[in-house]
């Protein structure tokens, strides 16, 4: 223990310098890298999970590159690409790539090309072709749905009958009600109007006929009720003339009294009666109650 303390206390002395030289021991760690390098090659073989002999045979021949080129198009259409994609992540995780990056200066690049070819060999494994067969099952599974689809058609055939059964009744029920009220109303109105017009005309004609009949009766009665009062006065006078002769003078006065009811009677009938009773016509004033006429006769 004392020796390490003394060494730490006197670091500047020459003895420590030779002790410093031993630190190249770190070179010993350099040896581990080769050991680490060696494991990568061991890790490379594991990626070949197939363990089948054919895979290594395919990568061995040089014409393998053209073969992998052709499979990609075949692998693209089917859903197999997702399956091949999963292997690359498994191959990528290995720490082999990062370790080779450090050793390149120590190790010769040739091993890297040897490591490079395996990836392409791993990409086009025969697993895709094996994955292709599975797609056929889906087509077989798809056909069943079409077989199940045909059954639905029967329901449409069942649905139409109710529609046809329901549609006819409404039209038959709806039309009758509207026409019946309209026809009844129109017929009732026409009948009442026609009957009313006929009765009105009949009553009007009856009223006119009764009015005319009553008027004629009144006119006849008034004509019968006419009263004539006639008074005639005759006077005679004798007068002496200038030569001593005597002359007789006769004067006749007629007084006729007619009632005012004559205004309502027919004057023509009344005048005809006067012509029949009297040879001479007289002027009659309907407005005056009486009239007088004078006739003078001279006898020599």
From Swiss-Prot:
This one is known as Protein TRACHEARY ELEMENT DIFFERENTIATION-RELATED 7A
What does UniProt note about where in the body, tissue by tissue, this protein is expressed? Accumulates in cells differentiating into tracheary element (TE) which undergo secondary cell wall (SCW) formation.
User: How does this protein sit in the membrane?
Assistant: Single-pass membrane protein
Compositional bias ranges of the Pro residues kind? 12-181
GO cellular component annotations of the record: extracellular region; plant-type cell wall; plasma membrane
Q: Which UniProt keywords apply?
A: Cell membrane, Cell wall, Cell wall biogenesis/degradation, Developmental protein, Glycoprotein, Membrane, Secreted, Transmembrane, Transmembrane helix
Instruction: Indicate where this protein resides in the cell.
Output: Cell membrane; Secreted, Cell wall
| Role description | Involved in the secondary cell wall (SCW) formation of vessel elements (e.g. protoxylem and metaxylem), thus promoting tracheary element (TE) differentiation.
Segments in the Cytoplasmic topological domain: 209-300
Location of region: Disordered: 1-181
Q: What happens when the gene is disrupted?
A: Delayed secondary cell wall (SCW) formation during tracheary element (TE) differentiation.
Which residues carry a glycan?
Answer: 183
Q: Altering residue 221 to R: what's the impact?
A: In allele TED7-2/TED7B
Result of mutating residue 102 to S?
Answer: In allele TED7-2/TED7B
Q: Which InterPro entries match?
A: TED6/7
Stretches in topological domain Extracellular: 1-187
